[in-house]
Amino acid sequence: MRVEQLSIDIVGLAGACSYALDCIEAEFVNVKNKHGKRVAYISVCMAKYCAIQGDALQDLAICALLHDNALTQYISEEVQKYPDTDIKNDLSENKTNMHCVYGEKNITKIPFKTDISNVILYHHEHADGTGPFRKKWHEIPLFSRIIHLADIVDIIGNSIESADHRWDFICQYLSQNKDRLFDSECVNAFQKGLTKESFMCLRDDSFETKLWEIVPREKQFFDWETCKNVADFFAKIVDYKSSFTSRHSIGVAEKASLLAHYMGYDSVSVQKMYLAGALHDIGKMAVGNEILEKPDKLTDDEFSKMKNHVGYTYLILSEVNDFEDIRDWAAFHHEKLNGKGYPFGKTADELNEQERMMACVDIYQALTEDRPYKKGLSHEKTCDILDDMSQKGFIDSDISKTIRECFGRI
C-alpha cells in the first residue's frame, strides 16, 4: 500500500524559522529583526548575475534564511562549558567555526534539490584565506560567498544610523574589501543586482514581498523519513534555546505522532502531528532565557511574557502557506476546554481533537521528562494528574484515558 506524502512549503517554513533565529541573534548578538530574510533578499538579488535560477535559487534562499541555524546550539554548548563567557564578544571576534560546523551538519536534514555541500560550513570565509577555515575564494562554494557578503552588508548597513548614507557607505566598503573579504564576482553581482532603491527597501517590510516574488515557493512532497528529518531540524533549534527543555519538542513530536497512530489517524495526519509537535514551542525563541531558565517562581509580568510564546508560535507559523492545521495544533497547546487557557481563551467547542491531543501530550511530556530542577514523574503518576485535570474541565478526558493506554506500552 502506498503511503501518502505530506506537502510542505519548505521555503516558507525556512522563512518562518529565520524569524525565530533572529530573536536569538537579537538577544545575544545585537542583530536587528528579520536579518535572515534580509540576507536572503540580498542573496537572491545577486543570484541572477551569477546564473543562479530555478531549484538552485530556491536552495540558495533556504541556505541564506538558515545560515545561522546552529546559533542556539553553539551558544548553549559554550555557556555550558564556560558559564562566564561573553557570547557577544566571542562571536564578534570571529570565533565562528563551531557554529558553522554544527550548522553544516544540521542543514543536511533539509531536502535540497541541488548540491549545497559546505555552503553553511564556509559562509564566514574570506576571499583572501583569512577566515575561520583559511579557505581562499576559489575553494569556497559560490552560495557561501554570496551569503557571506549579504550577511556582512546587512549587519554593517544596519549599524549606520543615517539610512540615506547606507548605500554609499556599503558600496565604498565593498570596493575597499574586494579580493580581501569578498571576491570580485560577488562584489560585481551585488553592484549589478541591487540598486540604491532596491537596497533601501530593506528599511521597511516591502523587501519581504519582493523576496517572495523572486523566490519560487513550490510545495514539496515529503515521505515520512524526510518529514521527520525536517521536523527534527527545527525541533533541535528550539530545544537548544534552553537547557531546561533539551529534548522537549522532539519528545512531544514523538508522542503526538504515536498517539495519532494509536487513535487510527491516516499517515499524513500522523506526519502533521509530528511536525506540529516539533514546532509547538518555536515561539519560545522570542522569550528571553532569563525567564525560561529562572529558578524561582515567575512574577506576574514574567509569566505574562512566558505565555506570549504560544502567540509567537501562531504568528511565526502563519507565514507558511497552507499550514493552518499544523499551526493551530502547535499553537493551541495551552488552551483549556473551560476557556481559561491561552493565548486565545478558546472553549471546548472551539478546540478540535488534534488540538486537544497536543495539549495533553505537552503536559505529559513536561511532567515525565527530567529537567535540571526536577526528576521526571512516572507514567502512572502523570496519568493520574491528567485524569485530575480532565475532571476539572481543563483537558479532554477521553484523550487522557487513551494516553494511559497508549503510552503505557512504551
Task: Briefly describe each language-model feature range.
Residues 2-410:
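Histidine- and acidic-residue-rich, metal-dependent catalytic cores
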